[in-house]
Amino acid sequence: ASSSCESSGRRRQGFRVVQAEECWYKSLAPLMAAIRAQAGSGPIYLSIDIDGLDPSFAPGTGTPEIGGLTIWQALEIIRGCRGMNIVGGDLVEISPPYDLSGNTALVGANLLYEMLCVLPKVQYRS
């Protein structure tokens, strides 16, 4: 979650800010199509912050916020990056002391795997 002050600062720097509420109850495929069009062939750094997911999916973080993205939406974002010029990426904010069930680590590992699958030059089966 970010404050409106942080969001306005990011907008001034040219970032597009999408609040979680704008993503509720919908596919993120149209958003990813717009991002792909805007990014073109430019370099992309893909960063996933686990606390952007709803804590029902990933409770093991220091800053859980209800109303976050679903697992399916996170996958739409990552898979929507296929074919883009990804130059790096990361997944942050998993906190093992708060991950009592291990679910967050499992979600994080799967999302990292998905991120590796969309790197340039990865071969896909049809």
Task: Give the location of each predicted region.
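Active-site-proximal loop/helix segment associated with metal-binding centers of metalloenzymes
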Residues: S2-V18
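Catalytic cores of soluble, metal-dependent hydrolases
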Residues: R16-S126
